[in-house]
Amino acid sequence: MRLPLGVPFLAAALTAVTLTGTAPSATAVAESGGHCARLERVRVPGAALQREACLDDLTTTGLAGTDYTDPADQAGLTAAGTRTPSGVPGIQVDGYFPDSSGFNTTHGWRHDAQFVIRLPDRWNGGLVVTGAPGNRKQYATDKAISDRVLAQGYAYAATDKGNSGTDFYRDGVRPGDAVAEWNARTTQLTRAVRRVAAQRYGHAPRRTYITGISNGGYLTRWQLENHPELYDGGVDWEGALWTADGPNLLTSLPATVARSLGAAGDEDLYAAGFARGSEFLWPYHEKAYWGVTQKIYRAEFDPGYDPRCPGPTSGSSPEEILAPCASDAAYDYAARPASVRRAVARVALTGRIGKPLITLHGDLDALLPKAADSDVYARMIDERGRGTLHRYYTIAGGTHVDGLYDTHPDRLRPILPCYRSAFDTLTAWVERGTPPPADHTVGEPADGDVVDSCPLR
């Protein structure tokens, strides 16, 4: 996980808005200089390796069957019927920054701090940056985020966050090192790709947006708190909440492990923040999310609690990886030594955002329940006096991954179309001063295309 000096959800992987958005202007097209112009100038500052390619289509449609994307790493994040744009020619740059860990085997590199940068020929002058959700890698949000923003004319960049997979907690020396690296790698990539855009297009981006899902949403929050100078705004899709005194994942998930082992009941989950009405999702999350998520993040921040589980690896088979540690049923974050809270404090959020932020969270999220997450973060922002920079939209019927809509189409709705509307709302807020709607719950429509449409107003 070592960075150079001076560099200030396995579970799902195992497991009215237009699609094209606003097209780039004729001026923006002229500025780009033609198909893959200035390719020879593109050099990612600080990269240890890069591979450039001139491609006819940078979207998942055009990249299907190539090694320029990875559908397996996108599994479960979008509903099956999701429509995405295509036909976006331009330059793709894959590579990595210097790092001492090698969890990421993409391209056979076995090297972390991998990134992907996409530079469309028809550029609108903007840049969108994201970090992988869960413990996935750099191509995870290609369908959910990259396709549409590229079609709108934005340059796009994504990082693997510097570590990936369910053994990510082994990265680093001190508790919290692996998660702290996520933030550093996102900052590093943002700074680098702004210079790459200048090489390709002749000037730096006029607007830079940070966004992400789950852990990528956490990164969005952290970046706008700690490096607002790099961004013009962000969209946070169900970002994970880390606070030193709680709530955080380690205060809500132990009850789920206890329940799975018969040591707790439904009322204990309600007390931990899980929503009434989300019970139909609990059996799946018990098998695919709760146990593994608790044990690997507890190992990251509190390795002394049970050194034998998960130990040096979360498991050697899917069954072992997803199995909970029995000791986590009794885990009490509040009773743990102060050193654990200090480890979490290294990556904790404060609510002190410095640029506009829109947060989305499903009311049926059964991994990061909003009552113990985004509801709390919205209050933190208000308490810091930054409420005018924030809008918070609860998505009725939304859950943590849109792929579950395909299993429960009568009880869930995908969040992605609401996210697309939120991104357009953010850019209108930042660039034209259009006031976004006040905080509210986006209700479930009685009819219509819920997979690809979600007006926020």
Model segments located where?
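Secretory targeting and sorting signals
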Residues: 1-30
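C-terminal His-loop and adjacent cap/lid subdomain of alpha/beta-hydrolase
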Residues: 29-457
